[in-house]
Amino acid sequence: MSFTRLDKSRKISAPHGTELTTCNWQVEAAKRMLMNNLDDEVAEHPQALVVYGGIGRAARSWECYDKIIETLERLKPDESLLIQSGKPVGVFPTHENAPRVLIANSNLVPEWANWEHFNELDKKGLMMYGQMTAGSWIYIGSQGIVQGTYETFGSVSRQHFNGDAKGKWVLTGGLGGMGGAQPLAATMAGFCMLAVECDESRIDFRLRTGYVDHKATNLDDALKLINDAMAKGEAISVGLLGNAADVYSELQQQGVTPDVVTDQTSAHDPLHGYLPQGWTLEEYKAKQESDATGTVNAAKESMAVQVRAMLHFQKEGAAVLDYGNNIRQMAKDVGVDNAFDFPGFVPAYIRPLFCEGIGPFRWVALSGDPEDIYKTDEKVKELIPDNEHLHNWLDMAKERISFQGLPSRICWIGLKDRARIARAFNDMVKSGELKAPVVIGRDHLDSGSVASPNRETEAMQDGSDAVSDWPLLNALLNTAGGATWVSLHHGGGVGMGYSQHAGVVIVADGTEEADKRLGRVLWNDPGTGVMRHADAGYDIAKNCAREQGLDLPMLDTK
């Protein structure tokens, strides 16, 4: 079989409107969302099938992509398509309430679960890296991480600055698909931000889509923009063209200490995701092929320089946090023994939300009409009338977030709200208030769907950080509940060997059957997050389980 990764002639865009090209809306949704992942306005490098996160792909090759589309277009309502690391490998009879697509991406037996072995298989065309929402077809552009980042920066503001971020600034690295959300989220939370990015095209993309306010090509100009804005009490963001390790070190040498320091480069993948100091992008890309080992070593040494600077900033009083790209581990691998002295963002700022099943709930309007999203925004406000913080988020999102590809929205809600909101959306489709069905999903970064000891499950209070039964149970339960597609991935966010995680997507098509499926799946899915945290002993999760009536047989066992 031929194997084409790069095809510069490709330009993918998901169909809009109400005309079906498949047997029903469940299958149509899978087709459109796969295509949407590769839209030029959504993906980082769509002609190479790369959606975000280093080499996170939507399909293994263009031949596989074409065959997936062809298979979805002939799939019957009682069949399920199986995807193995981006390749369509089988269609089997199931039933109409079963998932239409079942996906497994990047999974390796633990002894072989490392980048070296994965890269061998990847070169042979036997695997692909699915990241989290790239290979599970529910990426929505940088908006997908904006609210989570906004929630984190809001928590940083409350914990360290009495809730007032005015006159404070954040230093970070990386403006890719995930990192690109940081500048907008920071300014929404009241901070100024300096974001270092080595690829100028990424800064330009974030400028064009409104995620970053200014571009600078040297540190002095960037700092002047930041300082002038803070003096006026304004919150702005600056994308600085440069190498993160260089800039962090230069700030340290100048004696400049930011108020908050983090990083969202693709440090999880040292071969493809982190530019070594002193290298050009062209040199980096060439050496990925000619000297993979040397490239990885050089990238990790540069990460160590950056992490040492972050540790220095922490000693100088900055609030320093790992934002989930595993840069601490990479630095520790090459001798920074105290790399973990600064915390990850989940245990420091997000875990109480996870204890209530609260996480990144997202939905997409298959009509392609932004008005459908604005109507659902208002429905969420109507159904959750007393959450001013959520209302503020939805208002800011409408005003400040540009849609990428099919119109979409994200908001962090939990066990008590997801199912009832999804069923309300289904009623809106049924009544014709929405022009077409709505796709509902989430990030794999959620309360019950991931095991990642250096990120989502870092520092669990019972020591169960590395137990990965939980995402497997989550995927099994969502399959049994009737989700439209379910995925099981390895290595997302933090790289090979460091995480296992599950995704779920379900369609609200206005039918009675969909109403029942939505009620099951979107109760069960966040319910597994409350279950996982209650099992680990968190009182917030135990109380939530009791209040919401979860049936957890060991809940009150001493």
From Swiss-Prot:
SUPFAM superfamilies: Urocanase. Binds 1 NAD(+) per subunit. GO terms for biological process: L-histidine catabolic process to glutamate and formamide; L-histidine catabolic process to glutamate and formate. Disulfide bonds: none annotated. The keyword Cytoplasm applies. Pathway: Amino-acid degradation; L-histidine degradation into L-glutamate; N-formimidoyl-L-glutamate from L-histidine: step 2/3. Its main location: cytoplasm. Its cofactor is NAD(+). GO terms for molecular function: urocanate hydratase activity. PANTHER family: UROCANATE HYDRATASE. This is Urocanate hydratase. The gene is hutU.
